């Protein structure tokens, strides 16, 4: 991965800000931990509705202490980022294997800095609880991911150890900030728009920040699009590779559209966090194909193995097939990794074996998309809803597969996997999921489940790990594999969610989709069917 430079939206970290952060570090530590000692940070309930997002403004009670806590996290993230960046400069000609996870941490720290900056410095009036909750949850996930990338290398030098230490310290600070936020968060949640109903694109649905020209663009068919770039392998477009087209996009806040004409593109692509609102439009599943073959067995860590990685907020993919062709014996091999907030994948295909789709972080929505794999082929720690998708377990090197491995590491994170009105099928014995992290959260609702799913439904990760703290649930499913009579009896498993509980995992209740999905032009069901 190329080293990225951190830039703030419409701002740059200058020398004065650097000095300001340094001078404030010790005083912030004192004020934050004094606040911590006088506060009881109660964990939110495992009940899904207790952390369903409300569209209210953040609470002003204890706001100063909370912002000081986030500022302290921002300071530490900046120091860690500086350390990682300096390490890449001093070791560019050596220790290239060690630099892979360092570059991962560098990119993740850039993303974290951007989110924390928005909370502390910008403090825009339209930032609501769901935004702040999402950013803090994602920032915490970023540090967990950095540590995971570092751990996948068998050894690294003292600088790498220092980065790992910074990541662990930052994890603690972010956990504290998240605790403070949730304890102060208003508990009221809107009950409107939870009764279901298909939501279609209409003019009044667009938020004020979507321009009229963008609305017309997002409503348009491929033939009507006026893309900023056209990729064609035969040279008939503006570019012959997707990477060239991405590099040609001008910086700005508007939507950038790239049309990928029918063909197979053998590339590994990274859309960094600073490249926002990118829309990739193909000519259809199986017609426009992006394929890579990186894998853990081939020397790439999980994060870097992705054929396509989208970190910039507002990412949209439509009518494209994403493939990792590494094969069933290659261990972790990601076809698509998404860490983009308010992202949409529509009418696409994601094809791999182990770890096909990495839903890394933030709010995501998948509609009418086929996802194929073997072990943990949907994993990560985003807040994600799958609707009208085909989840297909294929034959691999093992005799049993797992559809999901959700990675929620803190009970205050507003993350999880919601599979709604989908088809789950397979050609080998398969489990709906297993807990990758302590507070793993996954629900399957109003979906068809075929006979490939094991009667127990869910599998442990290792022994009794997370069986009491996970949250797994089912609601209104059908098909030969949908019976809950033989399911696991774990404390964290809910065989029959109530109507109210299930509503908490819908598009409107879980990812606040009514506020942003209309602007994308995608059809979606806001509530239960």
From Swiss-Prot:
Q: Which reaction does it catalyse?
A: [(1->4)-alpha-D-galacturonosyl methyl ester](n) + n H2O = [(1->4)-alpha-D-galacturonosyl](n) + n methanol + n H(+)
- Full protein name: Probable pectinesterase/pectinesterase inhibitor 35
Q: Where is the active site?
A: 355 (proton donor), 376 (nucleophile)
Glycosylation: residue positions: 86, 169, 193
| Pectinesterase inhibitor 35, as annotated region | 36-180
Chain sites annotated for binding substrate = 302, 332, 434, 436
Q: According to its UniProt entry, what is the function of this protein?
A: Acts in the modification of cell walls via demethylesterification of cell wall pectin.
Q: Sorted alphabetically, which CDD domains does this protein's record hold? A: PMEI-like_4 (cd15799)
Single GO cellular component term: extracellular region
Please name the source species.
Arabidopsis thaliana
Keyword Cell wall biogenesis/degradation assigned: yes
Residue numbers spanned by region Pectinesterase 35: 228-514
């Amino acid at each position: 991965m190329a080293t990225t430079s951190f830039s703030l939206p419409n701002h740059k970290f200058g020398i004065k800000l650097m000095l300001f952060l340094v001078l404030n570090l010790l005083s912030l530590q004192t004020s934050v931990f004094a606040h911590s000692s006088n506060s009881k940070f109660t964990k939110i309930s495992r009940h899904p509705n207790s952390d369903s997002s409300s569209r209210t403004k953040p609470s002003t009670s204890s706001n100063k202490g909370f912002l000081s806590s986030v500022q302290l996290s921002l300071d530490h993230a900046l120091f860690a980022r500086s350390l990682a960046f300096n390490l890449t400069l001093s070791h560019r000609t050596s220790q290239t294997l060690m630099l892979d996870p360092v570059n991962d941490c560098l990119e993740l720290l850039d993303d974290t800095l951007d989110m924390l900056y928005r909370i502390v410095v910008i403090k825009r009036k339209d930032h609501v609880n769901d935004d702040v909750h999402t950013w803090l949850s994602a920032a915490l996930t970023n540090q967990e991911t950095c540590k995971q990338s570092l751990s996948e290398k068998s050894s690294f030098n003292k600088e790498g150890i220092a980065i790992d230490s910074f990541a662990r310290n930052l994890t603690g600070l972010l956990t504290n900030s998240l605790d403070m936020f949730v304890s102060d968060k208003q508990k009221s949640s809107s009950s409107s728009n939870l009764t279901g109903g298909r939501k279609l694109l209409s003019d009044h649905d667009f938020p004020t920040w979507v321009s009229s020209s963008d609305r017309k663009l997002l409503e348009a068919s491929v033939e009507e699009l006026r893309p900023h770039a056209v990729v064609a392998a035969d040279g008939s477009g503006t570019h012959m590779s997707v990477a060239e087209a991405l590099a040609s996009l001008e910086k700005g806040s508007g939507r950038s559209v790239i049309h990928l004409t029918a063909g197979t593109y053998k590339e590994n692509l990274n859309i960094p966090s600073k490249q926002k609102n990118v829309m990739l439009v193909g000519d259809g599943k199986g017609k426009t194909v992006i394929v890579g073959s990186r894998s853990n067995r081939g020397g790439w860590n999980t994060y870097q193995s992705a054929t396509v990685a989208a970190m910039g907020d507002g990412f949209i993919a439509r009518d494209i097939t994403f493939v990792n062709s590494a094969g069933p014996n290659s261990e972790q091999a990601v076809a698509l990794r998404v860490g983009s907030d308010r992202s949409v994948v529509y009418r696409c295909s994601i094809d791999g074996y182990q770890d096909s789709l990495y839903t890394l972080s933030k709010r995501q929505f998948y509609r009418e998309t086929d996802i194929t794999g073997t072990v943990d082929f949907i994993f990560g720690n985003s807040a994600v809803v799958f609707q009208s998708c085909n989840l297909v377990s294929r034959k691999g090197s093992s005799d049993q597969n797992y559809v999901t491995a959700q990675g929620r590491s803190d009970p205050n994170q507003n993350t999880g996997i919601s599979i709604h009105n989908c088809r789950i099928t397979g050609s080998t014995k398969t489990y709906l999921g297993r807990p990758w992290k302590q507070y793993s959260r996954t629900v399957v609702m109003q979906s068809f489940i075929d006979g490939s799913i094991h009667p127990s439904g869910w599998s442990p990760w290792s022994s009794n790990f997370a069986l009491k703290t996970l949250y797994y649930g089912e609601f209104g499913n059908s098909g030969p594999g949908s019976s809950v009579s033989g399911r696991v009896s774990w404390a964290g498993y809910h065989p029959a969610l109530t109507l109210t509980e299930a509503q908490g995992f819908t598009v409107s209740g879980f990812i606040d989709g009514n506020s942003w999905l209309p602007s994308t032009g995608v059809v979606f069901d806001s509530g239960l069917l």
